[in-house]
Amino acid sequence: MSKHEILVQSVVDAIGDNEFQVGDKLPSINIMVRDVGYARKTIVKAYEELKDRGLVESKNKQGYFVISQETGVVLRVALLLFAFQSFQEDFYNTLREELGKKFQVDVFFHHNNISIFETMITNIKGKYGMYVIAPIQDDAVKPMLQTIAPNKLILVDRYLDLGPEYSFIAQEFENATYSTLVKLLPDIKKYKSMVLFFNSKTDYSPIGIRRAYERFLKDHGIKGSIEENYISGTIKKDTLYFIKNDSILWTFLKDCNQGHCVLGKDLGILSYDDNVLKEIIMGGITTISTNFKEMAKIAAKYVMDGNEIRTIIPTNLISRSSL
């Protein structure tokens, strides 16, 4: 074992034996240099590794303090998502499965709210060895994220340009949505009109989806509109509904069922972000989706080996009977 590894293990053992408890201060770097005889950079490296494991945190000008006695954990990972929607649950479960028990994953949600996002970053910064974050696509959050070292951060789901040194695994929304709508043009033309339910404040929808939809309507002469919310009981036949928000989708499907509407015949439904319910409910819902489990596997690999990754996950059309 190297000197810093010996020091790390000594502190881990001391924490495990309750010699250090949560809230206790570790000996200062200067004291450790004097008493142990190791170089200052060796002590700093050891304390920083203990930070990465989530066992200690550094307080400015005060020193290093014990914050956890979970000594079996190799690395604490902060996962910051939009909300616990079904597809993000798939991401979370896969990430945890891939990392295994030696990695502690703590999940947080920002709900597409910049103020909440800032509070979350402030609260978790410096307390985790790795950060997996689905960012709000707004320039205002860039400085917040750039306070985290590039080798400890990976952006997932949404793309935000933090610079060439930062890793990401993201979806691309505008061109992917547009090309999928073009692919579906023969099916879309079966309907008299099209409605997109889009509300970026409540369903966290990226603006690229709306832009793609508007461009598609214009380019192909399709009659269509955009609604922020669905009002129960307002279903119209011979209409294709493009629904991003799953809460709206479930209410809409309930009304369809009560009104004895046949999907793909009386009206059509196109959704976003696939899950097992959309596969089986009412004969299946046609969905535009990326593979969130694959995204999580790539993110887990980054957490474990730290090799830089900058990639866009393909978006796929999953055709079912709802069109």
Regions found by a protein language model. Give the residues of each.
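An alpha-beta-alpha
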Residues: 179-217, 311-323
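Periplasmic-binding protein-like
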Residues: 78-79, 128-136, 195-199, 237-245, ...
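Hydrophobic alpha-helical segments within soluble ligand-binding/sensing domains
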Residues: 159-195, 289-308
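Extreme N-terminal segment that seeds HTH/winged-HTH DNA-binding domains in transcriptional regulators
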Residues: 1-35, 310
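Flexible loop/hinge segments that line or gate small-molecule binding clefts
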Residues: 136-175, 273-284
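Amphipathic helical "hinge" segments at domain boundaries
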Residues: 29, 64-122, 128
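N-terminal helix-turn-helix
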Residues: 24-58
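Flexible loop/turn connectors
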Residues: 247-323
